[in-house]
Design a protein with these regions (language model features):
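Extreme N-terminal starter segment of soluble prokaryotic enzymes
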Residues: 1-3
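Aromatic- and Gly/Pro-rich donor/ligand-binding loops
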Residues: 5-14, 18-175
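Alpha-helix N-cap/helix-start capping motif
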Residues: 21, 187-188
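Alpha-helix capping/helix-boundary segments
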Residues: 123, 189-190
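Short, charged, surface-exposed secondary-structure boundary motifs
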Residues: 161-162, 212-215
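A short beta-strand/loop micro-motif in the catalytic core of glycosyltransferases
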Residues: 180-186
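Helix-loop-beta element that forms the nucleotide-linked donor phosphate-binding surface
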Residues: 191-209
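Single conserved hydrophobic/aromatic residue that forms the stacking wall/gate
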Residues: 216-224
């Protein structure tokens, strides 16, 4: 079958890469073709808060700190060094890691599929301020072109029923979730939210990184 995975495959961190890789390899080892599917990044429901001190600190005041405060200069240097290190990591991720997943610069939206798997990772964590994710109905199956729609080890992360109510998304997400053919989650919070919004008891699954290790890696001699 032609199976798509919609996950956090473009988010630049180790965990997102490993879970995407683990799920892709597990499905491929079952004899299927796998394509990563992109979601459209929307505006976050939550605005990232900036402290008033940081927001209104004048340029002149920051310059005075640089000139007269050794601790500030040290912290500033560490911040610049960290920024350079992260920039190098992003370059490596884009040019070496994403090709391992088969992910290119070209975005893939709503392809024709036999099955679309949404997950794993915090694909349902919609009340966060991350601009790389935002609020995206596609992560809840909206506008998909697959014959079957399922999740694997999906998570709401820090999102709760109370937060969905606060931002007026409870009904919309409930209706979208009811269109899934099967739902599995990886944590109790996500299990409870699915049960509350859909009256469906989702399957509790392990993270695909752990699944891949259990299925396809041999124990070391010390574990024998």
């Amino acid at each position: 079958m032609n199976i798509g995975i919609m996950s956090m495959q473009r988010i630049i961190n180790y965990g997102s890469f490993l879970q995407a890789y683990g799920l892709k390899k597990t499905i491929q080892n079952m004899g299927h073709t796998v394509t990563f599917v992109d979601y459209r990044v929307g505006k976050p429901l939550v605005s990232e808060s900036i402290s008033s001190n940081q927001k209104f600190e004048s340029k002149f005041k920051r310059m005075m700190k640089v000139f007269f405060s050794p601790p500030y200069r040290m912290n500033r240097k560490q911040s610049i060094d960290s920024s350079k290190a992260f920039s190098n990591f992003c370059h490596t991720f884009q040019n070496e890691w994403l090709p391992i997943l088969g992910v290119t610069d070209e975005r893939v939206y709503s392809p024709k599929l036999d099955v679309l798997v949404i997950g794993s990772d915090e694909v349902f964590n919609c009340t966060q301020s991350n601009l790389d994710v935002g609020y995206s109905p596609q992560l809840f199956g909206y506008e998909n072109s697959a014959e079957k729609l399922i999740t694997y080890a999906a998570s709401f992360g820090s999102t709760t029923i109370e937060k969905l109510d606060k931002y007026g998304k409870t009904t919309e997400i409930s209706n979208l979730l009811k269109e899934f053919d099967a739902i599995s989650v990886r944590d109790k919070n996500s299990h409870d939210i699915i049960k509350t919004l859909t009256a469906i008891y989702p399957i509790d699954s392990i993270d695909p990184v752990l699944l891949y290790c259990l299925l396809y890696t041999s124990p070391s001699p010390r574990d024998s």
